[in-house]
Amino acid sequence: MKRYATLSLLLGAAWLGAADAADPAGSGAEPAIVYSDAALPTHTIYRPARLMDRYPVVLWGNGSCVNSNFGYREFLAEVASHGFIVLAIGPHRDSPAPREQRPADPADWPPFETHYSQMQDALEWIAAENGRQGSPFLGKVAVEKVAVMGHSCGGLQAVRASVDPRVTTTVVLNSGMMADDDQYMRRHELERSILGEMHAPIAYFIGGESDIAYPNAENDWQALQQLDLAAINANLDVGHGATYQMPNGGPFARGPLAWLQWQLQDDAQARAMFVGAACGLCAGSDWTLRRHFPQ
């Protein structure tokens, strides 16, 4: 818990960026645009500039549960450019506000800036837009293909939102649960038993042993072995902050993007990143991959 508290103090300062920084477009075949809609002012939309197909939805939660996705814009635009509609908590182009020193005990912290229910709010909005005459999303949303995904504190938001029956897969980045009596867990309205309530495949992408969330993710992995649920745990030695701010999300983006492409787009090449003895994240890569695929 103390490790996550330390992270919360650091991220706001680390992700302050130039207000005039150009929005990235990603490297995929469908360059992304980034904006907010007046009807969903609490979120930023990352999506292909030209909506030529039906696109899966990715719901995003930020590290420290801050109300800003500014530090993830390279990564999220990269995801969108490969054919996804990403709805990220936080208004467009807002940088995290500087923070004062928090008390050591999370019981004394002010409330989180954001809540897992904002993922559900975004899903309700995009589903309505899919059927609204005059909407750019009319008939363009694959509402049956939905991922919840987040970094660190946002990863816990994704776990909490994952029991929604509309969720197709959960992606946990540099995160993992604590003990039930941990104040951090209570603030997320989380208990470890939620793993047993999950109904869809789950993927953990962690930054190696130097990642402050590594022990938490390991505990979750052990629990997942007992469940009839497809799951992976993939580590790349990049630490807790990973490479989200690098162009197109850097090398860490490769794993989560492939998982989304497999789970939500039925992409055979993406599947090969995780399945088989010679899989893309297996031996010979910089990743360490563990898999639990019940028959």
What residues fall within each predicted segment?
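A domain-start/cap signature at the N-terminus of enzymes
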Residues: 19-47, 279-282, 290-295
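Glycine-rich His-Gly loop
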Residues: 60-64, 152, 175, 207
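Serine-hydrolase catalytic machinery in alpha/beta-hydrolase-like enzymes
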Residues: 36-141
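Bacterial N-terminal signal peptides
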Residues: 8-14
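Alpha/beta-hydrolase-fold serine-hydrolase catalytic core, especially in secreted/extracellular enzymes
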Residues: 237-241, 246-295
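Primarily recognizes the serine-hydrolase "nucleophile elbow" in alpha/beta-hydrolase
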Residues: 124-197
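Bacterial N-terminal signal peptides that target proteins for export
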Residues: 1-6
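The feature captures the conserved acid-bearing segment of alpha/beta-hydrolase catalytic domains
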Residues: 168-246
